[in-house]
Amino acid sequence: MHNDIKDFSWVGSQENFVDKINIQYLNHIIVGRYGGNSNAGQYKNEDGCLVWFNEKEDWEFVMVLDAHNTAESAERVLELLENEKGHIKHLLSMAAIQKTFKMLEAKILSMFQSTEFLAICRNVKGETACLIVVRKDKYIWWFSVGDCVLYLFHSELSTFGQYQVNQRQFYEWIGQVNTFEQEVHCYSVGIKELRQGENRLFLTTDGLIECPNEPYSNPKNIYNAFVNCKEEESIKTMFQNIQENNVRDSTTIISWKINILKETTIP
């Protein structure tokens, strides 16, 4: 039986999954974690993730984090989101109109820019990349600091070679070194309409992309991994491939399918 509401969060300091592939379903959402190879020198995991969803209200709110030095910065971001969960979920319950996404953007920014959170960040060791993705109705909204990636896989977009939604940004972080402490705050936000039919959303930290021999540096290879294959098997195969290529960095994946029945923009 599917639950209408489910909340999940994890950070690598809780369980590191070094040498261990872990894949689990949260209703229709699949979360995959691999902590890297110990024989490549890995001994810790500083990734994190969060999943909220409500089927009745037709939304998902997910986040991946990729911290370095320690997992402290990822832990603080997860705590921040948890503290503001009620307000964020209220916004997500509203209609999928321009104003709703603008209010969500303003809320997320105000959280990261708050005096209290900035003071907390000054006392952590290390910093994190952060990618938040919201799917509401036939739209996705994203907020990104750093180099985590969101892909949108759809056959119509694949025809044009379009897979990646956000641009990876290096030298952006939240934590001890903090983009929101700078004179100008650097981050990326965007909204995109999904296509009619089956859309797959796929978030990942950089371990998958920067693996030795680069089996998945081309997003088309990730797209193809899901063709004629169950999603759990697809993600397991990706983890096995990076494991065999002796990846050191950890990888955290969140992925799910959305079938859009409504008409979408077309000339």
Regions found by a protein language model. Name each.
Residues 1-267:
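PP2C/PPM-type serine/threonine phosphatase catalytic domain
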